[in-house]
């Protein structure tokens, strides 16, 4: 899986910790944000700043922080489809994609979006 750079300000870390302490949900807008947050919160000590992740999320991964994801429809058999399948379950994603194809949703970067919750 490719690596991605990201920056997380102190304020964001505080907001996430506050939301989680109140049983709030964390919603990632895009797979880059999901990978960044899961990578950041897998560290023993969480620090703000510029970071890089090459985390490869696949079925069996235990999600630590993200509860829901807004993302586009990814290519089947791609690493990002594997990520969303790990997040919401392979069967759920297969049904979702069958529905999207049947209803002529647009795929890829400039296509339709989907909101999925962690299984």
For each predicted feature, which ranges?
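Surface-exposed, charge/polar-rich loops and edge strands
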Residues: 1-119
């Amino acid at each position: 899986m490719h690596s991605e750079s990201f920056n997380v300000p102190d304020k964001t870390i505080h907001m996430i910790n506050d939301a989680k302490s109140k049983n709030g949900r964390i919603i990632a807008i895009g797979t880059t944000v999901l990978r960044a947050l899961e990578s950041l919160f897998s560290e023993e000590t969480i620090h703000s700043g510029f970071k890089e992740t090459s985390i490869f999320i696949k079925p069996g991964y235990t999600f630590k922080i993200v509860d829901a994801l807004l993302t586009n429809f990814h290519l089947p058999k791609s690493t990002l489809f594997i990520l969303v399948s790990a997040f919401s379950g392979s069967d759920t994603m297969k049904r979702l994609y069958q529905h999207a194809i049947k209803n002529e949703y647009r795929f890829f970067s400039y296509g339709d979006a989907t909101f999925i919750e962690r299984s």
